[in-house]
Amino acid sequence: MPINLKKVASFGSACLLALCCLWNASMVVQAAPPTLPGYAHLLNHSDISSSQRGELLLGELQCVACHETDPASADRIWVRQAPDLSAIGSRVTPQFLTDYLKNPQAHVTGTLMPNIFHTSEKQARDGAVEYLTHFLTSLGGGLAAPKMGGSDAMVQKGDDLFHSIGCVACHGPQREDQEDSLYISLKHLASKTTVDALSDFLQNPSLSRPSGRMPHLRLDAKEARALSVFLLRDQLHNPQSLAADPGEEPGLGFAYYEIDGLNALPNFEDLTAHAEGSTDQITLNLPVSKRNNNYAIRYVGQLHAPTEGSYTFISISDDGSRIVIDGQVVVDNDGIHGRRARNGKINLSAGAHDFEVQFFNGGGGAELSVAWQPPGSSGRRGVPIPSDLLTTRTGKPMIPLGSAPFVSDPQKSRMGQRMFAAMSCVSCHPLDGLAPMRKAKRLNELDPDQNQGCLGDTIRRGLPHYDLADHQRADLKAALVAHAKTNPPLSPAETVQKTMAAFNCYACHQRDGLGGPSTALAEKYFQTTFEIDLGEEGKIPPRLDHAGAKFRPEALKSILTSDKLHVRHYMATRMPSFSPELADRFSQAIGAADDQPKFTEGPSFSEEMAAHGQRFVGVTGMACITCHRIAGQDALAIQGIDLSSVYDRVQPGWFRQFLLNPAAYNPETRMPQFWPDGKSPFPDILGGSPDQQVDSIWTYLSLKNSMPLPVGITPKGQ
């Protein structure tokens, strides 16, 4: 909405006067200090100065959003973007907003949001918060009534997912109480949002959290829904849900019938099912025992059409089948027959439609497949209906705790909008057309020892209260003192360290003795996706010591931004995706910090060298294929990293040094030392030179997926 800044300005003086009345002396709320896991890791390293830690806090707490700084300081202080509030009304309940604005620390343990009303009298505070709530809930069209439901089974799926793919690294285990400065609390979520909104957020976190501190885990719709149900599981027992309609669950319900003498689809309404259940897809492979003939199956639920238009549905079956949408028979493929395809068209509006598939088998072979052609698609065969578009209304309703009907008042919303600017909320949370009405002091003008400032013992009216711990205040003061003197550019090593702290890479990765999951967490929650004897290397994300020397720059960028070149297929913990800008900055910095150019030079290609390398990789050489897959073929014993991926990921110089002395680069590696004391077990090949022999392996690996298979590997299917 465009803002009349003149009116806002004229309103500003009166509003600020009112705010001064709000901010009179009162009791300071005692709560947990801001939780910054990356900062907590830095506290454990004696080589990191107080001012360096304070620089991180200045950015993460957004001090420079209000206190402008010079370009030199800006290079060292990276501002964490606050949540985007332009559509907050569509994802957060008004009741949570009200309680949170009154006292953020009391409702979200360790929140980075300061308490604006820490000196306000209750009546004045509540009035101001009411206006702000009406304004914020008007953004985004309001929170939609929850559609998705849950179940105990869905909670268990989400529980298993949360505690396996790496969520515990940042948020801690949710199966037991966990109050720790290394973990970001999630206890408030059940009163904050709905399964629908949280599911959308988990699939695209950067839309509302542009800072990237919550990364993209490449969750599909089913995974996001399961995680959301788990995180909001307290809503399943919400008394407000007792009278609510059932919620949506993924998949379709099915009913299985046994009927003798079938030669056509029966009237299902007159029958009692032999077994019932749910399925993610339309298939005959159901979790029930079926007999070979004279049975029928009915699949029922909702189909969510993504767009309005003409849809073609196709049924291929042996024997009969039928597709019914909104009570209308769209495809009739009934009767006794062999494999036969039938199709039909129907115009659908975007949204949910009653959906039913019927099938029977009278005898002989049995087959059923259902496909569709959405608007704009081509081809005659169609494609399977995406499973995330199929739901049933069988879930327990899930309603946010403490929620109630709410109607945004336009007049109160306008007052809240003006207050949002007057209180400088817009400094951290930019909104189109709004600007702060007053400017704070510049960063270099601040007095760190001001007792009534943000870092003082008695924070005066009008200033935000972060409830900082003593060591956090000390570090912030040290950073302010340092920045008043000199601001040298960040070194590559400092850039790497600051990135890993700000984005909490230390939760999973260790570098320079910092970070990595605790022993207790690693043993319990960092596992493999299948049984494989790789020890800690197979479970724990790799150390990042020497990572700049190891990776090709483009490979590292790809690892950080996409799911490409993620070669540890056996590791349950997922590598998140980050922004291209972050990936570019980090890959450049870590390359410079680890002297990347020194490792770029590799051997020239020759067929003779590749042939030697082929021998070394096979069972007549070093037998690398015992533990490594190669060109998509299984290894002989342990299904480790595929060697065909090495050339695209790794620098040749690092590869050479690693093979000659693996333990120097990873003390916990199971990679054997093939050239002990610089001596080769194959003295007759390439003059027994370890360097030459390693280079031959590199030359062979440069062929990637086109490499001829080494001795000991038989292609699949042969």
Model-derived segments and spans:
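Cys/His-rich metal-chelating microdomains
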Residues: 69-70, 173-174, 431-432, 511, ...
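Short tyrosine-centred short linear motifs in exposed loops/low-complexity segments
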Residues: 62, 166, 223, 307-313, ...
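Extracellular/secretory pathway-exposed regions associated with glycan biology
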Residues: 35-38, 42, 227, 231-312, ...
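Short, cysteine/histidine-rich loop/knuckle motifs that typically chelate Zn2+
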Residues: 65, 169, 427, 507, ...
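Electrostatic cytochrome c docking/interface patches
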Residues: 32-59, 138-163, 237-238, 244-245, ...
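N-terminal secretory signal peptides that target proteins for export/translocation
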Residues: 1-8
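Extracytoplasmic electron-transfer domains, predominantly the class I c-type cytochrome c fold
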Residues: 32-49, 73-141, 176-235, 407, ...
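Bacterial N-terminal signal peptides
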Residues: 12-25
